[in-house]
């Protein structure tokens, strides 16, 4: 955890003794620290095994020194640092297709040439970062207009995501797999279908020798299990 987060932030989350709010979007209770540790541990297990971590709370908004946007610790960032330190994998790529920009993951790896971060997200939208022209040599933001659907995602996937990741040549690809860009999600305005997520997962599965995924957003409880299954089918092909 301390490879990604400050001692003060970890201690702050650990000290929570009653229900409260860390920001306007992040409620916590006395059990949140344990849940967040288990989520980060699940991400590590996924990175080690090539699995899919069904983790809650999500992680990609968490900054090094504070929680944000439902996220306490950055699960995928913790998994990436673990893979480098414990698995000996030098080059890691992170693909974030959650509908929100993964600002926390971006910030943690901003100055690190060994980790590539690629984010597809609705823009303008929460958290307000990741707009046109942002990024650096190892941070690639692909902002998409509201109402973007399968064809739009396929266009930027084949035109931007795949060439960038292939050029970086990662030893491990971690997918921040949010499903809130789905057409039935209540918190966003995108039009990706079940087949769209299945297609992205299948394409992602070819981009590195090792691939793993970690659940991020997705707020329609009726459709989320089906979408995770669609992604698993894609990753397995």
Language-model segment annotations:
Residues 1-237:
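HDAC/HDAC-like amidohydrolase catalytic core signature
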């Amino acid at each position: 955890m301390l490879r990604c987060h400050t001692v003060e932030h970890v201690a702050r989350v650990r000290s929570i003794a009653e229900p409260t709010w860390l920001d306007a979007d992040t409620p916590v209770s006395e059990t949140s620290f344990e849940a967040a540790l288990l989520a980060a541990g699940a991400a590590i297990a996924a990175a080690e095994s090539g699995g899919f971590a069904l983790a809650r709370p999500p992680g990609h908004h968490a900054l090094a020194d504070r929680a944000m946007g439902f996220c306490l610790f950055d699960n995928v960032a913790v998994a990436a640092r673990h893979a480098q330190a414990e698995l000996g994998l030098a080059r890691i790529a992170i693909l974030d297709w959650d509908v929100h920009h993964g600002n926390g993951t971006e910030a943690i790896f901003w100055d690190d040439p060994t980790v590539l971060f690629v984010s597809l997200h609705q823009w303008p939208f929460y958290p307000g970062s990741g707009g046109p022209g942002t990024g650096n040599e190892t941070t690639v933001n692909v902002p998409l207009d509201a109402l973007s659907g399968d064809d739009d995602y396929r266009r930027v996937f084949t035109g931007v995501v795949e060439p960038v990741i292939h050029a970086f040549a990662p030893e491990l690809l971690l997918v921040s797999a949010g499903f809130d860009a789905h057409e039935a999600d209540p918190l966003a305005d995108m039009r990706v279908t079940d087949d769209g997520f299945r297609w992205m997962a299948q394409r992602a599965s070819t981009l590195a020798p090792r691939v793993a995924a970690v659940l991020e957003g997705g707020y329609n409880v009726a459709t989320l299990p089906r979408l995770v299954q669609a992604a698993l089918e894609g990753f397995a092909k």
